[in-house]
């Protein structure tokens, strides 16, 4: 699957495979070119996220989350999604401003979350 879309992300490909889910991501490095690889994983490896797009308000969201005690390992807008989901649950998407398609795997709850921006600017494909 990643091979079919590698032209959309020429800077590298990564995958994550678990018993009941597999994520593939091809990267176009824009924000945090060194550590912003996806799927991005939280500290206890229970939440995985892939983002296609850009979260415009990620810096203000990051400051709010840091004030609540969340610690970040990257400068990526994608990592904000992981922490926001930990904090807000399924309501995390209501806080996001930008153009995006998100796939998030919550290993603890065996839950796949798919979300797009309100306009649907970014495509979201799944099989």
Q: Whereabouts are the PLM-identified features?
A:
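N-terminus-centric sequence/structural signature that marks the extreme N-terminus
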Residues: 1-127
